[in-house]
Amino acid sequence: MTQQAANALPPVARTYQVRTYGCQMNVHDSERLAGLLEDAGYRRAADGADADVVVFNTCAVRENADNKLYGNLSHLAPRKRSEPQMQIAVGGCLAQKDRDAVLRRAPWVDVVFGTHNIGSLPTLLERARHNRAAQVEIAEALQEFPSTLPAARESAYAGWVSISVGCNNTCTFCIVPSLRGKEVDRRPGDVLAEIQTLVDQGVLEVTLLGQNVNAYGVSFAADERLREDPRMWQSVPRNRGAFAELLRACGRIDGLERVRFTSPHPAEFTDDVIEAMAETPNVCPALHMPLQSGSDRILRAMRRSYRAEKYLGIIDRVRAAIPDAAITTDLIVGFPGETEEDFQATLDVVAASRFSSAFTFQYSKRPGTPAADMPGQLPKAVVSERYQRLIELQERISLEENQAQVGRTLELLVATGEGRKDAATARLSGRARDGRLVHFAPGAAADEPLARRAFDQVRPGDVVTTTVTGAAPHHLIADGALLTHRRTRAGDAHAAGLRPRTGVGLGIPGVGAPAPAPVTTGCAL
């Protein structure tokens, strides 16, 4: 190939990779980061390939988050030395917390950005490349509601939808409010419009996201953009029924088959939400409600604003209205000052609650939180021993609850990446309406004509029904023939490699796109 012909070839876009740590909010923020970069001219790096830009979207909830980030950054240092044109960006909660300290610990990083200004990433990358100097930009308040940003969705069949950002609670163990700011809620019309956009692209399931979803309505944004003073939102009086109304409105969206939400706070959980869950067919019979501790004394020290009796009362009312609801929770073991009596109270509430599963954590001291300075910090050995006892109890309950599902017929939304052993076992995986993970045999459905069975391969995004044949603490098994198989637009999109996109973009196409690199071919070397 001649040099003239080589120069005539289209430029090669630089590639990116986003590495995500932490909660569902971070996962969704990473979709936005991907959307921003793609709008700016980057393309996603192939699996296993070295990306030109590596973005870390970090978590600051637990102490090992720091170690994980800086360990991974150190692994990239040799590559950065040999390929100075590659770029490394660090964003998210840990970046918001550490700020300039990121560069002190990892001076080869090119960009540091916070939770309030993720839309700045393409511009910061361009500025760092142009100036050949690291860029640190941490905003103190939200600059634009994140959902206005473009998002490159990971799933063709299920989508995250933020209904709020920030949190007004003051839990003594939690650093999130200081990093994410006060709660600001999206207007219902904006939330529903985003859901409709996803459904129009084939999405069957949405999960409504917020730090405290049942506080929704506390501070509606008057506009998706901040006014001149970034610390102020024009707001309207709180609507305490707003979240239940939003759930019912989701039920009126044609084509939306499943609605989930995470996470509600027990202190503000009201019966109108239970009624909306029970009376809205597409709201899934699943509730994730953090308990944290079963001890009233520890709950008070945590500033959780509820007590064990209130929590158990909510569970009783949910199960009365939705008998098949699967209830899951979060638990912290070893909070400062926790006695054996306090821990036993947690075991008692767990035993009474019969959670289908629980995310259980050993207390992690976070600088900047009130709990970090409390007396009575427990020895690691004590915390570890209690943690093991709690795990043993919850594993037994989870197994018993799953064994009760054997023989039931479940509808599954077929998923990808849920079963680590699917290839070895010749199974696929999917989620039941109550959120349980089911590994199933993908044999032809009994209701399909023979002529269609070869064509109707089960795909992620399709919907099947099957009968549960076995159980383990964390999943169900369904090894019989499928009872039904419904091909969906989501399955078509997944098979075609299409991903839904949402967001209005920044209005500045190409910002952050680096100068194109020339194509090299074997003939041009």
From Swiss-Prot:
Keywords: 4Fe-4S, Cytoplasm, Iron, Iron-sulfur, Metal-binding, S-adenosyl-L-methionine, Transferase, tRNA processing. [4Fe-4S] cluster 2 binds at residues 167, 171, 174. Binds 2 [4Fe-4S] clusters. One cluster is coordinated with 3 cysteines and an exchangeable S-adenosyl-L-methionine. It comes from the Bacteria. The keyword Transferase applies. Residues 403-482 form the TRAM domain. It catalyses: N(6)-dimethylallyladenosine(37) in tRNA + (sulfur carrier)-SH + AH2 + 2 S-adenosyl-L-methionine = 2-methylsulfanyl-N(6)-dimethylallyladenosine(37) in tRNA + (sulfur carrier)-H + 5'-deoxyadenosine + L-methionine + A + S-adenosyl-L-homocysteine + 2 H(+). GO terms for molecular function: 4 iron, 4 sulfur cluster binding; metal ion binding; N6-isopentenyladenosine methylthiotransferase activity. CDD domains: Radical_SAM. It is found in: Cytoplasm. Pfam families: Radical_SAM, UPF0004. The keyword Transport does not apply. Its main location: cytoplasm. Disulfide bonds: none annotated. Gene3D superfamilies: Methylthiotransferase, N-terminal domain (3.40.50.12160), tm_1862 like domain (3.80.30.20). [4Fe-4S] cluster 1 binds at residues 23, 59, 93. Catalyzes the methylthiolation of N6-(dimethylallyl)adenosine (i(6)A), leading to the formation of 2-methylthio-N6-(dimethylallyl)adenosine (ms(2)i(6)A) at position 37 in tRNAs that read codons beginning with uridine. Monomer. Belongs to the methylthiotransferase family. MiaB subfamily. This is tRNA-2-methylthio-N(6)-dimethylallyladenosine synthase. It comes from Mycobacterium sp. (strain MCS). The gene is miaB.
